[in-house]
From Swiss-Prot:
Family: Belongs to the protein kinase superfamily. CAMK Ser/Thr protein kinase family. DAP kinase subfamily.
One Gene Ontology term of the molecular function aspect: protein serine/threonine kinase activity
Gene that encodes the chain: STK17A
Protein name: Serine/threonine-protein kinase 17A
Gene3D superfamilies: Phosphorylase Kinase, domain 1, Transferase(Phosphotransferase) domain 1
Organism encoding this protein: Oryctolagus cuniculus
Residue numbers bearing the Phosphoserine modification: 9
Locations listed in the record: Nucleus
Length: 397
């Protein structure tokens, strides 16, 4: 095995990404780390950053020779007085491992200076899916969109899981789109919190983004592939409704909602969502990790295998026709128990969805019935920093 390169050592290739070190980190890479100035080969595009976190910033760049667009992720090697180069090496190794998977962002090359490492990544022009999650209803994802994108997310996650990689920070900000209009394909990004988890080993860490962490994280139980599946359940809920299911007014309340499974599948939140989609979410938002559906099982769920979904507009039209029939005293066909909507939790009525982050992304989707209940509890869609602050998380890629 060739030892990892340090700055100034020539930039020859390092070893294959097969070695696993302490704490579930990969320790070996095969990418040649380049030490010449990044600006010799790339020019940074003017305009706003693609993303920023405590220890990293992502900028759009242009390769001078080819004119191709990339995303450059500048990552500080020292964080809070600690050398975190090996965490960056791990992220590179995971990207190498997934280089042939179409649903994981592609790593182009790596540069290193005395203070930072620069990952040159595939540029996803469509941005984060969080933009659609918080959009007004006419601009948000429809269920068919979510079906297609969730199938891609699951195929990517299934690939990672078969290679013992658990992402541990799956959320709308870490799922990018190749294009916004027409709606493109997904790219899973940001493996800063990812870990290697093997069946014979136990890994316990407090990490993740509050709204998306699984109950076992909060109880300090072992992390597993099922930890990602919980996050996918939350992600699906958000993509379909624009509502963050467990969000409280603070982190403590959010964690309490997660640990006590305080969430709603009411008619108000899922008024345009199929019963099959709700069942899909319920297979994932299960407290015991061993009872959650795996990525492979999810890909076989009827919601993702059926050929079509009833048009949400048609479903709303039918509901209005039924309501009109009731007002006129006409009979309405009885709905079988197999197609009934989940019961409403009257204690929680969602009033609004507000984005809280370092900048405002604009008004989010609002419930159609928000004015009917003065004591409604707001659910806010926050872009939180991951719990493990030593590793970057609140940025694109």
């Amino acid at each position: 095995m060739i030892p990892l390169e340090k700055p100034g050592s020539g930039g020859s290739p390092s070893a294959a990404a097969s070695g696993s070190g302490p704490g579930g980190l990969l320790t070996e890479i095969r990418t040649a780390i380049r030490t010449e100035p990044f600006q010799d080969c790339y020019s940074l595009s003017p305009g706003r950053e693609l993303g920023r976190g405590k220890f990293a910033v992502v900028r759009k760049c242009i390769q001078k020779d080819s004119g191709k667009e990339f995303a450059a992720k500048f990552m500080r090697k020292r964080r809070k007085g600690q050398d975190c180069r090996m965490e960056i090496i791990h992220e590179i190794a995971v990207l190498e491992l997934a280089q042939d998977n179409p649903w994981v962002i592609n790593l182009h090359e790596v540069y290193e200076t005395s203070s930072e490492m620069i990952l040159v990544l595939e540029y996803a022009a469509g941005g984060e899916i969080s933009d659609q999650c918080v959009a007004d209803r006419d601009e948000a994802f429809n269920e068919k969109d979510v079906q297609r994108l969730m199938r891609q997310i699951l195929e990517g996650v299934h690939f990672l899981h078969t290679h013992d990689v658990v992402h541990l920070d799956l959320k709308p900000q870490n799922i990018l789109l190749t294009s916004e209009s027409p709606l493109g394909d997904i790219k899973i990004v940001d493996f800063g919190l990812s870990r290697i988890v093997k069946n014979s080993e136990e890994l316990r860490e407090i990490m993740g983004t509050p709204e998306y962490v699984a109950p076992e994280i909060l109880s300090y139980d072992p992390i597993s592939m099922a930890t990602d599946m919980w996050s996918i359940g939350v992600l699906t809920y958000v993509m379909l409704t624009g509502i963050s299911p467990f969000l409280g007014d603070n982190k403590q309340e959010t964690f309490l909602n997660i640990s006590q499974m305080n969430l709603s599948y009411s008619e108000e939140e899922f008024d345009t969502v199929s019963e099959s989609a709700v069942d899909f979410i319920k297979k994932l938002l299960v407290k015991k990790p061993e009872d959650r559906a795996t990525a492979e099982e999810c890909l076989k769920h009827p919601w993702l295998t059926q050929s079509s979904i009833q048009d949400p507009v048609l479903r709303v039209k039918e509901a209005l026709e039924e309501a009109n029939a009731l007002q006129k005293g006409d009979s309405v066909p009885e709905i079988s128990s197999a197609t009934e909507k989940p019961g409403t939790e009257e204690s929680i009525v969602t009033e609004e969805l507000i984005v809280v982050t370092s900048y405002t992304l604009g008004q989010c989707r609002q419930s159609e019935k928000e004015k009917m209940e003065q004591k409604a509890i707001s659910k806010r869609f926050k872009f939180e920093e991951p719990l493990l602050q030593e590793i970057p998380g609140e940025f694109i890629y």
